[in-house]
Amino acid sequence: MRLTGSVVISLEVELGWAKHDLNEYDHLSEDRRTETRTLSDLLDWCESAEVPITFDIVGHLLLDACDGNHEGRPGDEWFEADPGTDVESNPLFYAPDMIDAICSSPVPHDVCTHTFSHTPCGEVTSETVDWELQRAQDAHDEFGIPWSRAFVPPRHSSAPVGVLKRNGIDTVRAPEPCRLIQMNTGQRLYHNALSPYQPSDGRVCDGTAVTPSTPYISLGCPNLPMGQLDPHPVFRPIPVSLRKRWHLRRLCRGVDRAIRSDATLHVWSHLWDLSNVHQRDIVEQFIAYVGARQEQGEIDVLTMADFGRAIRQTN
């Protein structure tokens, strides 16, 4: 038995934690003003279209303040970037207002975990992953929201199944196998920006539901400015309007393929990727398209947790 055609949309909300270990912040706006506006717009569009999203949130962002000390995590110096202040002083590292906005929406969005401090799970011990997930779930408790059943590992890393189960996780997002590593720069640019989006079937591994996705952003358009960053120079001679039309068409055709094949299209991005006017234009139209196809009964729009429940029932 297979799922009917479905769409899953996941959005990574990381802000200053995204590249804190690399000391890179130029992709973000000052005091996250643009990211906050983008989230507000996105929630409005989702409400109009009745489209739920899975928000993959770094647990530290649920805090309104801290002293910068997070005892018990194995390893040294990981929290050097933590300002140890509060949301008013350093809104890139604390964002309870954003989580409030998500949870206050009439649309049943899902707040899933992206670890507590954006830790690449494949680069640390299982004990560290365990601490990260425990602390993230504790942050959910402290904020007054349910534990996350779904998990998006930072930077497409993987986590031990036993650690996931111990922390209440039963659904994960994982990239489809891809030949990107074997491609030259030109081939990568083509694959990331122009190749069709193909829906796929999920799977259950050791009791954990896996929703496949691309290894590169798919909701946001990689050949347009991403956040505050310029696109690769090879795309700049192409008119912006043409790039926007092509990406919207690419997304909508992916939905159509999911309908025809009774498979699942999982598109994702970072919040910062979408935080400029060009990206927002595309996403607004795509959300409306998905909502219309859902209203016509042609497709289901699922959160990651919904997807996990559904696929376990079919296996």
Q: Could you say what each language-model-derived stretch is?
A:
Residues 23-34, 80-92, 117-127, 147-149, ...:
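The substrate-binding groove and active-site-proximal loops of carbohydrate-active enzymes
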